[in-house]
Amino acid sequence: MISPFLLLAIGTCFASSLVPEKEKDPKYWRDQAQQTLKNALRLQTLNTNVAKNVIMFLGDGMGVSTVTAARILKGQLHHSPGEETKLEMDKFPYVALSKTYNTNAQVPDSAGTATAYLCGVKANEGTVGVSAATQRSQCNTTQGNEVTSILRWAKDAGKSVGIVTTTRVNHATPSASYAHSADRDWYSDNEMPPEALSQGCKDIAYQLMHNIKDIEVIMGGGRKYMFPKNRTDVEYELDEKARGTRLDGLNLIDIWKSFKPKHKHSHYVWNRTDLLALDPHSVDYLLGLFEPGDMQYELNRNNATDPSLSEMVEMAIRILNKNPKGFFLLVEGGRIDHGHHEGKAKQALHEAVEMDQAIGQAGAMTSVEDTLTVVTADHSHVFTFGGYTPRGNSIFGLAPMVSDTDKKPFTAILYGNGPGYKVVGGERENVSMVDYAHNNYQAQSAVPLRHETHGGEDVAVFAKGPMAHLLHGVHEQNYIPHVMAYAACIGANRDHCASASSSGSPSPGPLLLLLALLPLGSLF
C-alpha cells in the first residue's frame, strides 16, 4: 500500500507541473489585480436607474461549494484547469450573503425559502405563498394568511411576467410566485387529503391556471398534473406513472386556453421542436410543459423533445421583451437540488453549468442600464470537495491521498450524508474499483440516508443592473424581493418613484443615499 504522504507528495509535484507558464510570473497576478481594482473603482458611480426589467435566477440547492465546483467543471469542459474560470455570475459586480432559515427550521426547505425571496416574508417549511401563521398541511390555517409575490406586483404594474423552470411548474420554487398553499406537495387534487379538499383549499396546478390568469410565459415540466386521472401522456403512452393525476376531471390546458383573450395568440407546446418553431413576435401567451414530472437532467436530455434551460430562457425573453413597460422573469435551475439529493454530483454540477449558460444568454439579450439581474440559491447542500487535490484535478476525480483508517482512496467530492454510504464486505467501498466518473455515480457520504439533505449555511446573492448595490452585505433572505421591487418601482415601492418622477428625477435615486446609510435592521 502506497503511503498517504507519498501520494500527497506526488500530487504536489503533479500540481506544480500543471501551473500555466504565465502564472509563474508575478506580473500576471499584479496586472490582474490592478485591472480588478480599476473595475471596482468604476463602481463608485452607482446605477440608480429604474429597472424596466427584473430577472431572477434561482439555483435550487446551489450553495457556495456548488458554485465553486461548477466553475471548475465549466473550465474543464473547455479544456482548462478550471479553477481560474469565470462563471457568468462571477462577473456580476455586487455580491451578498442570504440567511436561509425558515421561521420554524434552522435548515430550510425550498418552499419556505421561495416564499421569502419571492413574497418578501419568511414562512414555515413546506408552505408556499403564505405567512408563518399557516401551519403545514393545515388547510384551515391558510385563509387570511396569503402573501403576494413580486410576480404579482410586476403584473399589477402592467409588466409582462414569466416562469421558467427545469422542475415541475407547480414545484416549490415556481409555486410561491402564484399560489397560496399550506403544503408544497399538493401538486394536484390527487395529492390532497379529503379534509383539505372539503375545506375549500385548491391544489397548486389549479391555482397556476386561476390565480393569475395572464402569466405570459410558463415553461417547465408537470404535464400529468394538468390532466384527468389516467389520461395517457402524449409522449410516454405506455408509462402509467406519466398519466394524468387529476381527480376532478379537469383539463387545465383547455382551461388555460379558455382564459386567453380571443384576439391574442396563445400557444401550448410539449416538445422542443414545436417550441423552437415558434415566432416569438407572434406569441402573446406560451405554456410549455415538456415532461409529465420534472424535466430531464441536462446530461440525459433528448434534443428532439426537451429544450435546454438556455433555450427556454431565450424564448421567454423574446416574448416578454415586447412589452414597453418591461417584464419580470423567474428562472429556476431546479434540478441542481435533485442531483444533490440523489448524491449524483455530476448531474447536479452539469445542471449548474447549464444555468450559468442561461444567465449568459439573458445577459446578451438585455442591458444593465435597465435590467436588474439577481442570481441566488434557496439553500445549500451538505456537498463538499477537498483532499488537497492538485491544480487541474478532475472535479470528479480522486484526492491524492488515502484514508488514515482503511487505507483506501476517496473522491474529492463527498457528501455529509446521503445514499452514497456504501459498505462492501463490512468495509467502505473501494472507489478505485468503480466508475466514479459515471453520470449517475453516487459520491460517498459519511452518514447513510435515502436522500441527501440540505445545508444550513448562508448562500450567495449575485446582482447587476439598476440598484444592484443594495445587495451588499449579509441579509435576511426575504430582503431580496424588496430590493427588486424598489429597483423596478413596483409593489410597496411605487410611491417613492412617483414622487421622484414628479420632482424631475429620472430614477428612484432620492431615497438611495438614505437606504445605503441605514442599518439593515432599521428597514424591516
UniProtKB/Swiss-Prot annotation:
Task: State the lipidation positions (GPI-anchor amidated serine).
Answer: 499
Record organism: Bos taurus (Bovine)
Cross-referenced PROSITE patterns, in alphabetical order? Answer: ALKALINE_PHOSPHATASE
Biological process terms in GO annotation: biomineral tissue development; bone mineralization; positive regulation of cold-induced thermogenesis
Judged by the first EC level, this protein's enzyme class is hydrolase
Q: Which SUPFAM superfamilies match?
A: Alkaline phosphatase-like
Report the cofactors: Mg(2+); Zn(2+); Ca(2+)
Explain what switches its activity on or off, per the activity regulation comment.
Phosphatase activity is specifically inhibited by 5-((5-chloro-2-methoxyphenyl)sulfonamido)nicotinamide (SBI-425).
Q: Which reaction does it catalyse?
A: a phosphate monoester + H2O = an alcohol + phosphate; diphosphate + H2O = 2 phosphate + H(+); pyridoxal 5'-phosphate + H2O = pyridoxal + phosphate; phosphoethanolamine + H2O = ethanolamine + phosphate
- Oligomer and partners: Homodimer.
Task: Detail which positions bind Ca(2+).
Answer: 235, 290-291, 306
**What is this protein's name?**
Alkaline phosphatase, tissue-nonspecific isozyme
Q: What is its EC number?
A: 3.1.3.1, 3.9.1.1
Share the domain note from the entry: Calcium-binding is structural and does not influence the alkaline phosphatase activity. At very high concentrations, calcium can however substitute for zinc at zinc-binding sites, leading to strongly reduced enzyme activity.
Q: Which PANTHER family match?
A: ALKALINE PHOSPHATASE (PTHR11596), ALKALINE PHOSPHATASE, TISSUE-NONSPECIFIC ISOZYME (PTHR11596:SF74)
Write out the function statement from the record. Answer: Alkaline phosphatase that metabolizes various phosphate compounds and plays a key role in skeletal mineralization and adaptive thermogenesis. Has broad substrate specificity and can hydrolyze a considerable variety of compounds: however, only a few substrates, such as diphosphate (inorganic pyrophosphate; PPi), pyridoxal 5'-phosphate (PLP) and N-phosphocreatine are natural substrates.
Give the residues annotated as active site: 110 (phosphoserine intermediate)
Q: How is the cofactor bound?
A: Binds 1 Mg(2+) ion. Binds 2 Zn(2+) ions.
The membrane-topology field of this record reads: Lipid-anchor; GPI-anchor
- Residues listed as glycosylation sites in the UniProt record: 140, 230, 271, 303, 430
Entry's localization field: Cell membrane; Extracellular vesicle membrane; Mitochondrion membrane; Mitochondrion intermembrane space
Q: Which residues bind Zn(2+) 1?
A: 60, 110, 378-379
Modifications the protein undergoes after translation, according to the UniProt entry: N-glycosylated.
Q: Which GO terms describe its cellular component?
A: extracellular membrane-bounded organelle; mitochondrial intermembrane space; mitochondrial membrane; plasma membrane; side of membrane
Instruction: Note the SS bond partners.
Output: 139-201, 489-497
Q: Where does Mg(2+) bind?
A: 60, 173, 332
Q: Propeptide positions, renumbered to this chain?
A: 500-524
